[in-house]
Amino acid sequence: MILSGEEIRSQLGSNIVIEPFDPARLNPNSYNLTLHSELLTYEEVVLDMRCPSRTRRLHIPAEGLILNPQQLYLGRTAEYTETHNLVPMIEGRSSIGRLGLFVHVTAGFGDVGFRGYWTLEMFAVQPVRIYPGVPICQIFYHQIIGDFAEYASNKYQDNRDIQPSLLYKELPREEDPQLPLGFRD
């Protein structure tokens, strides 16, 4: 069952933390989260799941930043959230989707007990100008039935910034089959 907006408001400070909280962004069954002023892009041409990838930080100026098609941008919400005894989920706003901007490629599902900022996996199908502080996605909450343990992984928990993929920490690393270069940079 999904919580109503009024139920979200009533659980603030106990099972739900949203900081900062603006009552004007509360919807009938969700809350609008806003875009922070920075993005990350990957520098590698090919991303290897078994290796950490270099990133480049971009600032979104007040006059906006144009996102190019066929480029993955990692952003984050400006709001810090905590969820206890509920399952948090985020979904892109329909007004954003109608501009051809995907806000999260796959990871809209959160874990009970998650604390931190939501990393957004943004992908534009055509050039789109974005702005810091724009309401970019909605968070909503499901009740959980049955016994559970709160999220305890240290991989993304308590993050304070945009989080690139940390999948490499879960995978065994194999040696590179290529010969080393005979010169140094």
Q: How should each PLM-predicted stretch be described?
A:
Residues M1-D185:
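DUTPase catalytic domain/fold
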